[in-house]
A protein has these predicted regions:
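Short, His- and charge-rich active-site/binding loops that engage polyanionic ligands
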Residues: 63-93
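Short amphipathic alpha-helix that is part of the acyltransferase structural core
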Residues: 1-47, 51, 56-63
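Charge-rich, low-complexity intrinsically disordered segments
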Residues: 102-105, 170-210
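Short connector loops at helix/strand junctions that flank enzyme active sites
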Residues: 52-54, 67, 96-101
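Acyl-donor binding region in acyl/amide transferases
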Residues: 80, 86-173, 177-182
Length: 210
Protein backbone atom coordinates (compact mmCIF):
# COMPACT_ATOMS: atom_id res chain seq x y z
CA UNK A 1 0.00 0.00 0.00
CA UNK A 2 1.40 3.37 -1.07
CA UNK A 3 0.47 6.90 -0.06
CA UNK A 4 -0.19 9.56 -2.68
CA UNK A 5 1.32 13.02 -2.35
CA UNK A 6 0.00 16.00 -4.29
CA UNK A 7 -0.76 19.71 -4.22
CA UNK A 8 -3.88 21.34 -5.66
CA UNK A 9 -1.86 21.98 -8.82
CA UNK A 10 -0.87 18.33 -9.20
CA UNK A 11 -4.05 16.66 -7.92
CA UNK A 12 -5.22 15.95 -11.48
CA UNK A 13 -2.55 13.23 -11.68
CA UNK A 14 -4.42 11.23 -9.02
CA UNK A 15 -7.89 11.01 -10.49
CA UNK A 16 -10.62 12.10 -8.09
CA UNK A 17 -8.39 11.98 -5.00
CA UNK A 18 -8.67 15.66 -4.09
CA UNK A 19 -12.47 15.70 -4.17
CA UNK A 20 -12.65 12.37 -2.34
CA UNK A 21 -10.31 13.75 0.33
CA UNK A 22 -12.55 16.80 0.90
CA UNK A 23 -15.53 14.46 1.27
CA UNK A 24 -13.68 12.37 3.85
CA UNK A 25 -12.75 15.50 5.80
CA UNK A 26 -16.41 16.55 5.80
CA UNK A 27 -17.44 13.11 7.03
CA UNK A 28 -14.92 13.13 9.88
CA UNK A 29 -14.83 16.75 11.02
CA UNK A 30 -18.30 18.09 10.15
CA UNK A 31 -20.61 15.07 10.29
CA UNK A 32 -18.95 13.03 13.06
CA UNK A 33 -17.04 15.62 15.14
CA UNK A 34 -19.58 18.39 14.65
CA UNK A 35 -17.04 21.12 13.95
CA UNK A 36 -18.51 24.40 12.68
CA UNK A 37 -16.09 25.00 9.80
CA UNK A 38 -16.42 25.99 6.12
CA UNK A 39 -18.14 23.29 4.08
CA UNK A 40 -20.32 22.94 1.01
CA UNK A 41 -21.99 20.00 -0.74
CA UNK A 42 -20.49 17.44 1.66
CA UNK A 43 -16.96 18.77 1.22
CA UNK A 44 -14.76 20.57 3.78
CA UNK A 45 -12.03 23.08 2.97
CA UNK A 46 -10.63 26.22 4.59
CA UNK A 47 -8.20 29.09 4.04
CA UNK A 48 -5.19 26.83 4.63
CA UNK A 49 -5.95 24.77 1.52
CA UNK A 50 -3.77 26.92 -0.71
CA UNK A 51 -2.78 26.00 -4.28
CA UNK A 52 0.77 27.32 -3.93
CA UNK A 53 1.99 25.78 -0.68
CA UNK A 54 -0.37 23.18 0.79
CA UNK A 55 0.67 19.53 0.45
CA UNK A 56 -1.65 16.54 0.82
CA UNK A 57 -1.14 12.86 1.62
CA UNK A 58 -3.90 10.36 0.85
CA UNK A 59 -4.51 6.62 0.92
CA UNK A 60 -7.08 5.31 -1.57
CA UNK A 61 -8.84 1.97 -1.56
CA UNK A 62 -9.40 -0.36 -4.52
CA UNK A 63 -12.32 1.83 -5.64
CA UNK A 64 -10.18 4.99 -5.63
CA UNK A 65 -11.98 6.31 -2.53
CA UNK A 66 -9.74 8.19 -0.08
CA UNK A 67 -9.76 6.38 3.27
CA UNK A 68 -7.07 8.42 5.05
CA UNK A 69 -5.51 11.81 4.53
CA UNK A 70 -3.32 14.52 6.00
CA UNK A 71 -2.33 18.07 5.15
CA UNK A 72 1.01 19.86 5.49
CA UNK A 73 1.89 23.56 5.31
CA UNK A 74 5.37 24.93 5.95
CA UNK A 75 5.43 27.48 8.74
CA UNK A 76 6.97 30.18 6.55
CA UNK A 77 3.42 30.36 5.13
CA UNK A 78 0.21 31.10 7.09
CA UNK A 79 -0.73 28.12 9.29
CA UNK A 80 -3.47 27.24 11.77
CA UNK A 81 -1.66 27.27 15.10
CA UNK A 82 -0.16 30.69 14.50
CA UNK A 83 -3.21 32.26 12.85
CA UNK A 84 -6.08 30.82 14.90
CA UNK A 85 -4.91 29.46 18.26
CA UNK A 86 -1.53 30.94 19.28
CA UNK A 87 -2.61 30.65 22.92
CA UNK A 88 -2.06 26.89 22.63
CA UNK A 89 1.68 27.59 22.44
CA UNK A 90 1.64 28.78 26.08
CA UNK A 91 4.39 31.32 25.41
CA UNK A 92 6.58 29.09 23.24
CA UNK A 93 7.94 30.89 20.20
CA UNK A 94 5.97 29.78 17.18
CA UNK A 95 8.11 28.75 14.20
CA UNK A 96 8.32 30.71 10.97
CA UNK A 97 10.67 28.53 8.99
CA UNK A 98 10.92 26.40 5.86
CA UNK A 99 12.42 23.70 8.11
CA UNK A 100 9.24 23.33 10.18
CA UNK A 101 5.78 22.44 8.85
CA UNK A 102 2.36 22.11 10.39
CA UNK A 103 0.49 18.86 10.00
CA UNK A 104 -3.30 19.17 10.09
CA UNK A 105 -6.59 17.62 8.96
CA UNK A 106 -5.18 14.15 9.58
CA UNK A 107 -8.09 11.73 9.52
CA UNK A 108 -9.08 8.17 8.72
CA UNK A 109 -12.47 6.91 7.56
CA UNK A 110 -14.31 6.00 10.79
CA UNK A 111 -16.10 3.17 8.98
CA UNK A 112 -12.88 1.19 8.57
CA UNK A 113 -12.38 -1.74 10.97
CA UNK A 114 -10.28 -0.84 14.02
CA UNK A 115 -7.13 -2.62 12.84
CA UNK A 116 -7.29 -1.07 9.38
CA UNK A 117 -8.06 2.33 10.91
CA UNK A 118 -4.93 2.18 13.08
CA UNK A 119 -2.77 1.00 10.18
CA UNK A 120 -4.01 3.74 7.83
CA UNK A 121 -3.29 6.39 10.46
CA UNK A 122 0.22 5.07 11.03
CA UNK A 123 0.95 4.80 7.31
CA UNK A 124 -0.26 8.32 6.53
CA UNK A 125 1.77 9.71 9.44
CA UNK A 126 4.87 7.86 8.25
CA UNK A 127 4.41 9.11 4.68
CA UNK A 128 4.19 12.72 5.80
CA UNK A 129 7.35 12.36 7.87
CA UNK A 130 9.20 10.60 5.07
CA UNK A 131 8.31 13.26 2.49
CA UNK A 132 9.04 16.12 4.88
CA UNK A 133 12.48 14.83 5.88
CA UNK A 134 13.43 14.35 2.21
CA UNK A 135 12.54 18.01 1.59
CA UNK A 136 14.43 19.60 4.47
CA UNK A 137 11.58 19.76 6.97
CA UNK A 138 12.86 18.68 10.38
CA UNK A 139 9.79 19.08 12.61
CA UNK A 140 6.00 19.00 12.47
CA UNK A 141 3.92 21.24 14.70
CA UNK A 142 0.35 20.20 15.40
CA UNK A 143 -2.93 21.03 17.13
CA UNK A 144 -4.93 18.04 18.31
CA UNK A 145 -7.05 16.41 20.98
CA UNK A 146 -5.22 15.19 24.12
CA UNK A 147 -6.13 11.61 23.17
CA UNK A 148 -4.50 12.02 19.75
CA UNK A 149 -1.36 13.41 21.37
CA UNK A 150 -1.20 10.22 23.45
CA UNK A 151 -1.55 8.24 20.23
CA UNK A 152 1.49 10.06 18.81
CA UNK A 153 3.40 9.05 21.94
CA UNK A 154 2.33 5.43 21.48
CA UNK A 155 3.64 5.58 17.90
CA UNK A 156 7.06 6.42 19.34
CA UNK A 157 7.16 10.01 18.05
CA UNK A 158 7.93 11.52 21.50
CA UNK A 159 6.03 14.77 20.91
CA UNK A 160 6.91 17.91 22.85
CA UNK A 161 3.66 19.32 24.23
CA UNK A 162 3.63 23.09 24.74
CA UNK A 163 1.24 23.14 27.68
CA UNK A 164 -2.09 21.95 29.06
CA UNK A 165 -5.12 21.57 26.84
CA UNK A 166 -7.39 24.60 26.36
CA UNK A 167 -11.11 24.46 25.67
CA UNK A 168 -11.99 25.82 22.23
CA UNK A 169 -15.71 25.69 21.59
CA UNK A 170 -17.03 22.41 22.94
CA UNK A 171 -13.72 20.50 23.01
CA UNK A 172 -10.20 20.67 24.41
CA UNK A 173 -7.10 20.95 22.25
CA UNK A 174 -3.36 21.15 22.79
CA UNK A 175 -0.36 21.87 20.58
CA UNK A 176 3.20 20.63 20.24
CA UNK A 177 5.80 19.36 17.82
CA UNK A 178 7.78 16.24 16.94
CA UNK A 179 10.80 15.36 14.81
CA UNK A 180 10.46 14.02 11.27
CA UNK A 181 13.87 12.29 11.42
CA UNK A 182 13.90 8.64 10.26
CA UNK A 183 14.91 7.55 13.76
CA UNK A 184 11.67 9.06 15.10
CA UNK A 185 9.49 6.93 12.85
CA UNK A 186 11.32 3.64 13.38
CA UNK A 187 8.85 2.43 16.02
CA UNK A 188 6.00 2.87 13.51
CA UNK A 189 7.88 0.67 11.05
CA UNK A 190 8.69 -1.91 13.71
CA UNK A 191 5.16 -2.16 15.12
CA UNK A 192 3.42 -2.38 11.75
CA UNK A 193 6.12 -4.26 9.86
CA UNK A 194 6.56 -1.50 7.30
CA UNK A 195 9.73 -1.66 5.22
CA UNK A 196 11.06 0.66 2.54
CA UNK A 197 9.58 3.87 1.26
CA UNK A 198 5.81 4.34 1.60
CA UNK A 199 5.62 7.32 -0.73
CA UNK A 200 7.16 8.15 -4.09
CA UNK A 201 9.68 10.97 -3.64
CA UNK A 202 9.58 12.83 -6.93
CA UNK A 203 9.81 16.43 -8.03
CA UNK A 204 7.52 18.34 -10.32
CA UNK A 205 7.69 22.05 -10.99
CA UNK A 206 4.36 22.61 -9.23
CA UNK A 207 5.48 20.77 -6.09
CA UNK A 208 8.79 22.44 -5.36
CA UNK A 209 7.30 25.95 -5.46
CA UNK A 210 6.39 25.76 -1.79
Amino acid sequence: MKVDHFTILTAHRFGNAFDSMLRLRHKVFVERAGWVIPNLNHREADQFDHPLWTHYFTIRDENEVVRACGRMVRTDHPYMLEALWPELAHGHELPKSARVAEGSRMCVDPDLPKGAHTYHHALCTLAGMEWAWAHGIEHFVFVTYPSKARALEQLGLKPTIYGPAIRIGEEEFLAGHYSTAPSSSQRIRDVFGIEGSVIDIHEHEEEVAA
